[in-house]
Regions:
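C-terminal/domain-edge helix-coil "capping" segments
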Residues: 19-40, 126, 138-245
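Acidic/histidine-rich, surface-exposed loop or edge segments in extracytoplasmic proteins
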Residues: 38-53, 94-99, 213-214
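Soluble periplasmic/extracytoplasmic beta-strand elements of cell-envelope proteins
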Residues: 42-47, 131-135, 180-182
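C-terminal motif of bacterial Sec signal peptides marking the signal peptidase cleavage site
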Residues: 15-17
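N-terminal segment of the mature soluble domain
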Residues: 52-141, 184-190
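Bacterial N-terminal signal peptides that target proteins for export
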Residues: 1-8
């Protein structure tokens, strides 16, 4: 299952590149033809793919909020993880894999063909106008010590045993978690990739003058933070879009 989830994250890198966004607005990208989703629309929501194992704890809560937000204007149907995994693996096999047999490089064309194959299985009659591939992805936030900003949000860095002078150690880029939505039309043509910042997964300590970074056990516990991030990622699907220049 981990391999299946990892394959799904390739599209975001294809569209936005490998560099991560460090500004305070979501780094959204749209196809030239995308003008937003007419309301109401029928949306097929695929399972959330966590970028890392530690993000799996947030899948249930974020899924609930995502469905709730989308249902304010659209009809939403979900797909179970077992059904999705089986269909996606079959789609990959049908196109001969999505990596080059000679170089091992990711094959963008085959990836998009696999998406089209997948939707022929999951959306054969074209009943759904939009199909969403959601993921919990690692991003880079711009930290100024006490706070970090990325993908439309500002979050406080959690620290223990630090005075103001020592915050300078965490100026610059720090890891963050965002919700990424890759949206396609019913035939598998890419429409948009949108983001919303969720949480900072780490907290920081200094003991015996040694700085340490720790993974939060409860990184997805702040429901207000999750709600804000989900709402930001969903905005391009709830009305007309303002495209980044």
């Amino acid at each position: 299952m981990k391999k299946t989830y990892g394959l799904l994250l390739c599209l975001g890198a294809l569209i936005t590149g490998c560099a991560t966004n460090t500004v305070s607005i979501p780094d959204n990208h749209y196809s030239d033809a995308y003008r937003g989703v007419p309301s109401p629309a029928s949306i097929l929501l695929l399972p959330i793919s966590p970028d890392k194992d530690e993000y799996r704890h947030g899948v249930s809560a974020v899924t609930h909020l995502l469905v709730e937000d989308l249902q304010t204007r659209h009809t939403v149907e979900t797909v179970s993880v077992p059904v999705f995994n089986a269909s996606w693996q079959q789609a990959i096999e049908d196109v001969g894999g999505i990596y080059s047999a000679t170089s091992g490089a990711f094959d963008r064309e085959r990836y998009f063909r696999a998406v089209e194959e997948l939707l022929q299985e999951l959306n054969p009659e074209g009943d759904h106008d939009i199909v969403i591939f959601p993921a919990l992805v690692e991003r880079q936030a711009q930290s100024t010590g006490k706070y970090a900003t990325w993908d439309g949000v500002r979050r406080a860095n959690i620290t223990d045993g630090l005075d103001n002078a020592r915050f300078s150690r965490w100026h610059g880029s720090v890891g963050a978690v965002s919700l990424q939505l890759n949206s396609f039309d019913g035939q598998g043509r890419w429409l948009a990739t949108s983001y919303g910042g969720l949480v900072l997964p780490h907290f920081y300590t200094i003991k015996d003058k040694i700085p340490r970074t720790h993974l939060k056990d409860d990184m997805f516990a702040d429901e207000n933070a999750l709600e804000e991030g989900v709402r930001l990622a969903v905005v391009p699907l709830l009305g007309p879009v303002v495209k980044n220049k």
